[in-house]
Amino acid sequence: MSIVSLTGIEVLNNPAKFTDPYEFQITFECLEPLKEDLEWKLTYVGSSDSLDHDQELDSILVGPVPVGINSFLFKADAPSPELIPASELVSVTVIILSCSYNDKEFVRVGYYVNNEYDTEELRENPPAKVAIDHVVRNILAEKPRVTRFNIVWDNEEGADEYPPEQPEDEEEEEEEEEEGEEEEEDEDEEDDDDDEDLNGDAVVDLEKEEISTPRDNDEDIEIDIASESEVEEGGVEEEAKVNTPKD
């Protein structure tokens, strides 16, 4: 559970010139006392193609933070135009307002920013070189994108970093259960081997050939009995032909 919850952000000084500072009235709730300060940071995304053009406009430490509802005014300077690609100065970009505790970010709010010229003439016929003094920004304050992250707070040190250790007794019981299961499997395999030795070729025949129906078994028994009776009585060694009821 997050100890600090962001409850509201009011975007001030909007719309404004590109070179004007950013202003935010930030409100958050703290559920428990914090040992460290909160770090708030505003980042301007200078290019959609590379992070190298991102600019950290300002950062501020807020603390000590009392329990309850807290509010403060966060101001940040405008980005440096010379650090932004000329093709992306007059376009749509993003600013990111984030908060961290103990160098761990737990909330991030992103806003789209539309940069355009302040006159219709410049919008229709933009100059070859960007006239930054005539560029205005408009933050889409009504459509923020909020992302939250789980972190370890003061009262949760080590709670999420390492899994709980199992007692040694439980580990020994699990090992004994595994050994018992292995012994039972070995015994089952030995029993299967004994069955094959006792049945001889019959087991092999069942694996290689189709299983006979009860009627076929009866016929085989009759053949064996007839053959044995003929050998005992007449001493005839020729194979006896036994016709089935269909024959």
UniProtKB/Swiss-Prot annotation:
Gene Ontology cellular component annotations, sorted alphabetically: chromatin; chromosome, telomeric region; cytosol; H3 histone acetyltransferase complex; nucleus
Chain spans, region Disordered: 151-247
Pfam family, one: ASF1_hist_chap
tRNA-binding is among the record's keywords: no
Family: Belongs to the ASF1 family.
Major subcellular location class: nucleus
Entry protein name: Histone chaperone ASF1
Matches recorded under InterPro entries: ASF1-like, ASF1-like_sf, Hist_deposition_Asf1
Acidic residues biased stretches: 154-199, 217-237
Organism of this sequence: Candida albicans (strain SC5314 / ATCC MYA-2876)
Entry keyword set: Chaperone, Chromatin regulator, Coiled coil, Nucleus, Transcription, Transcription regulation
Basic and acidic residues: bias regions: 205-216, 238-247
Subcellular location: Nucleus
Subunit structure: Interacts with histone H3 and histone H4.
Function, in words: Histone chaperone that facilitates histone deposition and histone exchange and removal during nucleosome assembly and disassembly.
Coiled coil: 165-193
A GO biological-process term: positive regulation of transcription elongation by RNA polymerase II
GO terms of molecular function: acetyltransferase activator activity; histone binding
